[in-house]
Amino acid sequence: MAVGKNKRLSKGKKGIKKRVVDPFSRKEWYDIKAPAFFEVKNVGKTLVNRTAGLKNANDSLKGRILEVSLADLQKDEEHAFRKVKLRVEDIQGKSCLTSFNGLSITSDKLRSLVRKWQTTIEADQTIKTTDGYLCRVFVIGFTRRRANQVKKTTYAQSSQIRAIRQKMFQVIQNQTSSCSMRELVQKLIPEVIGREIERATGSIFPLQNVLVRKVKILKAPKHDAQKLLELHGESQDVGTKVVKDVAPLESV
């Protein structure tokens, strides 16, 4: 066996052991405040690095997009399949004031609606609210059986699909053209647009599960601190409750 120097035994430690720094010690929590047209205003908290040197914590928070379940905002599990996007517009103390920045439904809900023996009909319309928001509304619906129908399938003809899509365009335009963003959200929560489409298209072909699949904000108006404060109302944890219009649909 060769005799030599054991490098592992004689090798010393290089330098001093580095001190472990907790990364959360450099961060601080901010409260997230939702607009007043949601029932719950105090949504949760978000992390951000503390203000240090030229880096301001407020600048890091402004423009941040947060995704929240509508069930948490409305205290109602019926809305668990909807997701709402909130955008941080301004900082007041340790509170982030947000604005509505979009709506969508979960992928598992969408997949559960697509079935055999029916036709899927989709439409989208670009609208502008009275307070300057340019957004695109996506709607989806599915055909259903007529009254006393024996046939298994419920496929719609191409002419019927075109006619239904035109009705969807008309309903979206009529329901959204003369309302602000606050009024639009209050129509989206109880699904007013979907039920109105079902009523309007009943004479062409009966539909079911008509939903506003997505709302995308294309352009928002210039930030106005006064309007943002009006949007949030008084600084309380509970906002206004949206009344559900649960009028039953007439049988076709």
UniProtKB/Swiss-Prot annotation:
UniProt GO cellular component terms: cytosol; cytosolic small ribosomal subunit
MF terms (GO), sorted A to Z: structural constituent of ribosome
InterPro entries in UniProt: Ribosomal_eS1 (IPR001593), Ribosomal_eS1_CS (IPR018281), Ribosomal_eS1_euk (IPR027500)
GO biological process: cytoplasmic translation; ribosome biogenesis
Residue numbers bearing the Phosphoserine modification: S251
UniProt family annotation: Belongs to the eukaryotic ribosomal protein eS1 family.
Protein name (Swiss-Prot/TrEMBL): Small ribosomal subunit protein eS1B
Organism of provenance: Schizosaccharomyces pombe (strain 972 / ATCC 24843)
